[in-house]
Amino acid sequence: VNDPFITTDYMTYMFKYDTVHGQWKHHEVKVKDSKTLLFGEKEVAVFGCRNPEEIPWAAAGAEYVVESTGVFTDKDKAAAHIKGGAKKVIISAPSKDAPMFVCGVNEKEYKSDIDIVSNASCTTNCPAPLAKVINDRFGIVEGLMTTVHAMTATQKTVDGPSSKDWRGGRAASFNIIPSSTGAAKAVGKVLPELNGKLTGMAFRVPTVDVSVVDLTVRLAKPATYEQIKAAIKEESEGNLKGILGYVDEDLVSTDFQGDSRSSIFDAKAGIALNDNFVKLVSWYDNEWGYSTRVVDLIRHMHSTK
């Protein structure tokens, strides 16, 4: 672990106690010394370097590094971890030039000679599997996506300056805040056949975790809502099990807290205007689900060695 801003005892505290996900109830987590954490009996080295090139990943035996600062998101900057001895870098955010992979959608296109990848965003991971099913079965002519997104750390607790996004500077816990998102367009990067066919926006809302996507699309091949539901249910129990979920109960956002799936289709929430125009609703735990996909992508990358 590398973090130049916090100490090992504070790392332990933050890991053990989480406002959203509760207390850590599994193996003991404690501090061995200022440069080592203990997860059960396993030692984890801790560094405090500001420059990724200076982190001794090789000495620690770290082959796969998750770049989750939000700062080093392009290939050149993320490559600094390679200079520090890492073999592969997984960027936990969209990247303008690193190849983007979404588990269940295009991860099989990964080749072992690719050293720096992006796991896309939590929001892209939600509509992408859903859009893949719909496009494969019925074809998507065009579509609009809206994510109703829980608060994140980039927002303000009270009104504050935000010169690039004036609305984004308003108090997160007291407002519904319209915002931009590249998540829908990014679906076109992992599903090239949808490139240019999807775009979208976001509403930031005063909840702390779990978000929901509204994907409204025009279909190439007519289909009833029942046929669409059946196709999604079939894939959720087959090829996309563990990635795409299906629920037909009257659930709300907190019911999906801690759900490790990327996208949980809500059969009762969607509607169809006609057999060519449909609104699909899918939930995601933007923290837990996305973190699980990062691990899944690393596992897949390792399996290609």
Swiss-Prot record:
Annotated binding of D-glyceraldehyde 3-phosphate, by residue: S121, C122, T123, T152, T181, G182, R204
Keyword Oxidoreductase: yes
Domain of life: Eukaryota
Metabolic or biological pathway, per its Swiss-Prot or TrEMBL entry: Carbohydrate degradation; glycolysis; pyruvate from D-glyceraldehyde 3-phosphate: step 1/5
InterPro entries, A to Z: GlycerAld/Erythrose_P_DH, GlycerAld_3-P_DH_cat, GlycerAld_3-P_DH_NAD(P)-bd, Glyceraldehyde-3-P_DH_1, NAD(P)-bd_dom_sf
Top EC class for this record: oxidoreductase
Marked site: Activates thiol group during catalysis: H149
SMART domains: Gp_dh_N
Gene Ontology BP terms: glucose metabolic process; glycolytic process
Subcellular location per the Swiss-Prot or TrEMBL entry: Cytoplasm
GO molecular function annotation: glyceraldehyde-3-phosphate dehydrogenase (NAD+) (phosphorylating) activity; NAD binding; NADP binding
Subunit-structure text: Homotetramer.
Further remarks about this protein from its record: Plants contain two types of GAPDH: cytosolic forms which participate in glycolysis and chloroplast forms which participate in photosynthesis. All the forms are encoded by distinct genes.
PANTHER family: GLYCERALDEHYDE 3-PHOSPHATE DEHYDROGENASE (PTHR10836), GLYCERALDEHYDE-3-PHOSPHATE DEHYDROGENASE GAPC1, CYTOSOLIC-RELATED (PTHR10836:SF112)
Protein's name in the database: Glyceraldehyde-3-phosphate dehydrogenase 2, cytosolic
Organism: Hordeum vulgare
